[in-house]
């Protein structure tokens, strides 16, 4: 019997949750484990117990590899109020204006959910949560960055309605694989995202999952979508797109350098000819 070809590298291999569309697929499946994983992850990031989450219907399910479609809208509840969130995985920093992009998204989210005539005291909290597979701020060692509106003295809060949270995964690579009971919940989640698709970390990944119920649900959800050949095709297409993009940029840079060299030589010859004529 002929073995069916698959992009899955070996039985039991897991997809890479650091790939933007895979991250989204992990948390947006219509399954109990996917919802439980998302609820637990948000509870860890927001540092408060979240009791329910609802994903925007216009964003379900993942259907495109376009990076702009990897953000998904969430309404979540704690014991007292609703909160509105955009959440995403960002594999690359394509510009030096990532902070401007985050501000736009959180402002757009708040504007979308605040109804005309609403009492200002009823304006909900809006969050932009970005899990980053790159370092955004090299001036601090902490990989968990939270931004709110403050006065210029940096001490007094101006508003808590809009918040931006970055989880910089590369900074957690520096934390050794210590006994899991010594890790914070956020550190465990970061290591889950970092290690999920790495075969040599599979045993530590199991220990992580067994130590945190929410991460166990995330592991189950990731294992479930890893059975799908369509998801492996999506992940492969993602890496192909990145390679094509890098090649295009590299080619453009080399052409620019060659053109600049030609223009420099031409100007040098012209200057030399002018000097000879003096």
Region locations from a protein language model:
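Elongated, amphipathic alpha-helical interaction scaffolds
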Residues: 1-278
């Amino acid at each position: 019997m002929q073995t069916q070809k698959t992009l899955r590298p070996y039985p039991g291999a897991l997809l890479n949750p650091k790939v933007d569309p895979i991250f989204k697929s992990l948390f947006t499946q219509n399954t109990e484990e996917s919802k439980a994983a998302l609820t637990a992850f948000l509870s860890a990031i927001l540092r408060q117990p979240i009791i329910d989450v609802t994903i925007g219907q216009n964003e379900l399910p993942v259907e495109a590899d376009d990076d702009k479609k990897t953000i998904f809208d969430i309404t979540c509840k704690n014991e007292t109020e609703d909160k509105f969130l955009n959440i995403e995985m960002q594999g690359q920093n394509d510009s030096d204006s990532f902070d401007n992009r985050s501000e736009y998204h959180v402002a757009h989210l708040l504007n979308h959910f605040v109804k005309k005539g609403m009492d200002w005291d009823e304006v909900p909290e809006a969050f932009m949560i970005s899990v980053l597979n790159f370092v955004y701020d090299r001036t601090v060692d902490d990989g968990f960055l939270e931004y709110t509106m403050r006065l210029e003295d940096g001490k007094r809060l101006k508003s808590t309605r809009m918040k931006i949270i970055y989880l910089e995964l590369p900074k957690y690579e520096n934390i050794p694989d210590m006994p899991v009971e010594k890790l914070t919940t956020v550190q465990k989640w970061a290591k889950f995202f970092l290690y999920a698709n790495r075969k040599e970390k599979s045993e530590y990944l199991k220990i992580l999952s067994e130590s945190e119920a929410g991460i166990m649900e995330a592991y189950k959800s990731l294992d479930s979508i890893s059975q799908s050949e369509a998801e492996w095709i999506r992940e492969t297409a993602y890496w192909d797109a990145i390679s094509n993009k890098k090649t295009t940029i590299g080619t453009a840079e080399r052409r620019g350098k060659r053109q600049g060299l030609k223009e420099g030589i031409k100007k040098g010859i012209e200057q030399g000819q002018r000097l000879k004529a003096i």
